[in-house]
Structures are given as C-alpha cells and as structure tokens.
C-alpha cells in the first residue's frame, strides 16, 4: 500500500520565505580532540505551507539542524532568518532570552519521536497547556484544544490519559499540541519512529494535509524514505551538508 499524499504548491508569493538558514555551522568540543564539525555551511529555505523532509544516516546532523532551526541551540556561524526577521547572526542571538522563548512559543511547534506528553494530564489538558502557558486563560484554551483534537479524530479521547491512548493517538495529541498556538513552522524529529506502518502512514498523511490546509511549514526528519519522497522537497544530510535526495 502506497502513501497517498497530495503534493501542493506552497506559499503565496515567489519570493516569500518562512525560514531561511544561511551557511549554518555547528561544532562540538570533545575532550582532548579537535572540535567535531556537525553542520558545515547549511543553506536551507522553506516557503509558507511547504513540507520539507530530511533523511540521512544516524549521527549525520539531522537533529542538530532541527535544534538550530527551532532556536533550541546556537549556531557557531551563519544566519537564521524567520519570516523576514533575523534571529541569529553567527552565535549572536538578536533577541533577549525572554523574547526568544516567547518567539519560539508563538511561531514554532515541535513534534518528537517520543511524544513527551505529561502523564498526569489528559489529552485535552496536554494540548490546552500550550496556549494556557502564554495567555493564562484556561477555558478558551480548552475550547480550542477540543476543536483541534476533534479535527484529528480524537473527540472520544479528550479525557483520556496518555497511558490510555495508542501510540498513534499519542502522536496525534502531540501534533495537536504543536499546532495549538498556530505556529508558522512545525519541526518534527522522527515522529513515526515508534509507530507501526499503518499508524506511520496515517501520521504522515495527516501532517501533509495540515501543511496544505493551514499553510503551516513543516521540516520533518525521517528514516521513512517512502514518505520523504512524497514531500514538496526531500533533502539528504551527508557530511554536514544538505543536497537534494537522489542528487
């Protein structure tokens, strides 16, 4: 059975970019050894509503790239520009810590292989919390969370704890949480890593549909080459650089 993911034409303007990374470099220091360069001059641009997949061997730098794009880590060199506004110039962040945290909460959603749902809170509460933290208003947050979860086929599971949900349901809750603040960009790191093939397929088709409907940009790290090939663009990470899949 093949994935049925409709490609779409992202963005509304030829020159408009949601995210632009220019010559990003990241190295890590190792005791008694020269610094290990993980990313070596990464260039990446992502348009509004575009879905980009990144494949590559374990340890090739894919997760490091997502951490930089999500402002969870700092580049050594290069620039990161989000929706036309510079965020990093080299290792210098142009926002204060408070501004950066607020920016990340408003503009970027994250989905991980391990969903990181809070075990003592229901599906509804886990999703609502993403908005509640920023607004302090619980009732409207729960109302919006309920609508979003219903759209993702979880209407009957709102009051269930994560332990009472299947793996596929848990990841759908994680996606709802990532979308709660209407981010312009969602970064996903091996979101189907713990799912069977059926749930993986459903998850990827869901993300492709959301990307199209909401004009939300997605950058997804995956080992699923079948899905990767259905995205608007597939990139391969090797030796700290990106190139087109098959290139």
UniProtKB/Swiss-Prot annotation:
It is found in: Cell inner membrane. It comes from the Bacteria. It is a peripheral membrane protein. Residues 19-247 form the ABC transporter domain. SUPFAM superfamilies: P-loop containing nucleoside triphosphate hydrolases (SSF52540). The keyword Cell membrane applies. Its EC number is 7.6.2.-. The keyword Electron transport does not apply. GO terms for molecular function: ATP binding; ATP hydrolysis activity; transmembrane transporter activity. InterPro entries: AAA+_ATPase (IPR003593), ABC_transporter-like_ATP-bd (IPR003439), ABC_transporter-like_CS (IPR017871), ABC_transpr_LolD-like (IPR015854), MacB-like_ATP-bd (IPR017911), P-loop_NTPase (IPR027417). ATP binds at residues 56-63. Keywords: ATP-binding, Cell inner membrane, Cell membrane, Membrane, Nucleotide-binding, Translocase, Transport. Pfam families: ABC_tran. Belongs to the ABC transporter superfamily. Lipoprotein translocase (TC 3.A.1.125) family. The complex is composed of two ATP-binding proteins (LolD) and two transmembrane proteins (LolC and LolE). This is Lipoprotein-releasing system ATP-binding protein LolD 2. It comes from Chlorobaculum tepidum (strain ATCC 49652 / DSM 12025 / NBRC 103806 / TLS) (Chlorobium tepidum).
């Amino acid at each position: 059975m093949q994935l049925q993911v409709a490609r779409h034409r992202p963005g509304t303007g030829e020159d408009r970019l949601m995210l632009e990374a220019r010559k990003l470099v990241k190295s890590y220091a190792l005791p008694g050894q020269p610094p290990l360069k993980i990313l070596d001059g990464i260039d990446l641009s992502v348009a509004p509503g575009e879905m980009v997949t990144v494949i590559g061997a374990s340890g090739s730098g894919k997760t490091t790239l997502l951490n930089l794009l999500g402002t969870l880590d700092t580049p050594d060199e290069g620039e990161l520009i989000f929706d036309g506004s510079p965020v990093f110039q080299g290792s210098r962040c142009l926002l204060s810590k408070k501004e950066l945290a607020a920016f990340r909460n408003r503009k970027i959603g994250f989905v991980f292989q391990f969903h990181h749902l809070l075990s003592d809170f229901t599906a509804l509460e886990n999703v609502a919390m993403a908005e509640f933290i920023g607004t302090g208003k619980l009732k409207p947050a729960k109302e919006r969370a309920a609508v979003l979860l219903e759209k993702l086929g979880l209407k009957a599971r709102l009051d269930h704890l994560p332990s009472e949900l299947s793996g596929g349901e848990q990841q759908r809750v994680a996606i709802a949480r990532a979308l709660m603040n209407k981010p312009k960009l969602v970064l996903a790191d091996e979101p189907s890593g713990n799912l069977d093939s059926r749930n993986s397929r459903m998850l990827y088709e869901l993300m492709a549909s959301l990307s199209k409907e909401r004009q939300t940009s997605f950058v997804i790290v995956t080992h699923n080459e079948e899905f990767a090939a259905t995205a608007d663009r597939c990139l391969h990470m090797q030796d700290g650089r990106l190139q087109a899949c098959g290139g």
